[in-house]
Amino acid sequence: MTKNSYSNVNDNTPVLVGNSQLTDKRGIEGFNYLEILTEVSKKAIIDCESSTKLDDHIDTVAVIRFVADTPHRDSATSNLWGYPNMPRSLSNSLNLSASNEIYTTTGGNSPQIALNELANRIKDNQIDCALLAGGEALDTFVGRLKDGLEVNWEDNPGGEPELIGKSVDGTNDHEKLHGLFDPSSVYPLFANALRNEYGQSIAEHMQDTGELFENFSKVASKNKYAWFPTHRSAKEIAEVKPENRMIGLPYTKYMNSIMRVNQSCAIVMMSAKKARDLGIPESKWIFMYSGSCINDIWNVSDRINYHSSPAIKRCTDSVFELANISVDQVDFIDLYSCFPSAVQVAMKELSLNKDDPRGLTVTGGLPYFGGPGNAYVMNSIATMMNKLRSAPGKFGLATANGWYITKHGAGIFSSKPFEGEWNQVADTSYMQKTIDEANKPKFTEVPEGNCTVETYTVVHSRNGPDKGIVIGRLDDKTRFIANTERSSNVLEYMSQKDMLNTSGKVSNDGKRNIFKPN
């Protein structure tokens, strides 16, 4: 890579020039939300190695929304949220004079949405230099609440940030009524549909999933920022034990994302001209060769099936097309990994297998590296940046996912200088229209009669099987959602027997739909 190759980069080309990650395991003594963003942002600014004080040049501060600030969620944490304008709070904490304050909506796809937005504004000469930060301090927050300690975490600097992203609840009232809200209860529905597609028994699928996630935990074991830096075997991950209880059939605890973490990340993006003016070494420069965001059919109950994702396919196709490379030419990969089915659906759409020699994560994934709420992809991209800085000319792919395999993002990154006019955020409007207008299965909220199980899960509490969730089809193929009777006999039966494609009867009891196996 020559000096001349960097000189061919247009002034308004966006470049990622700094990043930092922080993991705080001090429990109840840990950082609050503002502190954990402030500390990591300071380090990201230092990482740029600017020859001129960078702080004075940051004109935009963007923050990924925190879980405790999630609309539509009634919880102790959301009721205690005390940062009405976190971008301004962060700007003030860092003594910046940023004129643009941006806050994202809910979703694990938010970091890619933010990068796309910031990159386009740099390209259009609307902004010059942006700081993007995100993370969680839930371990400290929840720990203090449980111990009865004060949580006076608040700062109100005035003003309202600009909101970017789609702010719509991930489920409708009918889905929520039947238990489709907590991700740990929804992603297992995709898992059982996947094993039906692959012709796997429950045990075979759990073993296959254990092998997939053993590879992830191995990466996490070598990551100094990982919340759980432990290499677990496939057997450890798949085997149900008191310390690894079933959460939602077929997923054990070790297959679930861990969100109660204190982790944060910050990334600095600016125009190539600004990077040159500030004397930032070209060895720090990483280019976003393409970025794309697109949604699947919004509601889970309306999906065509539960083993594929038209949006992931279109999203990743679009970033490869814009970057003018194929998946085979990517050297580093990070697939969003909140639950195994999120990875497996993406693998299917990208034609990847679990033993790909490149690996499918650069961090270790959300169950092992940690799942800092909506901000995880910040960490995967920061990790990707560092790998690419040490691998001149190589490419990396990072994917993102919000809600329930609902909202998707993808980005391709490289240290290879981008030459020519930068216009690398995909226009997905036509693709989105095609997905939204697809023929959805007929659905009824009040099913009655004979039926067949399309997919299902048994949600477990610490005391054992607690609730059955069934998505099924009536004889005329009309889809429905139902619960099962909460008797121990029924729940134990459903926990032991493979219920896929089995028959039963469904009816409405006046409150919700109830499925009874034959």
Residue ranges and their predicted role:
Residues 34-52, 86-87, 307-323, 380-384:
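Short, well-ordered amphipathic alpha-helical segments that serve as non-catalytic structural scaffolds
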Residues 105-136, 181-222, 267-274, 322-325, ...:
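Active-site-proximal alpha-helical scaffold in enzymes
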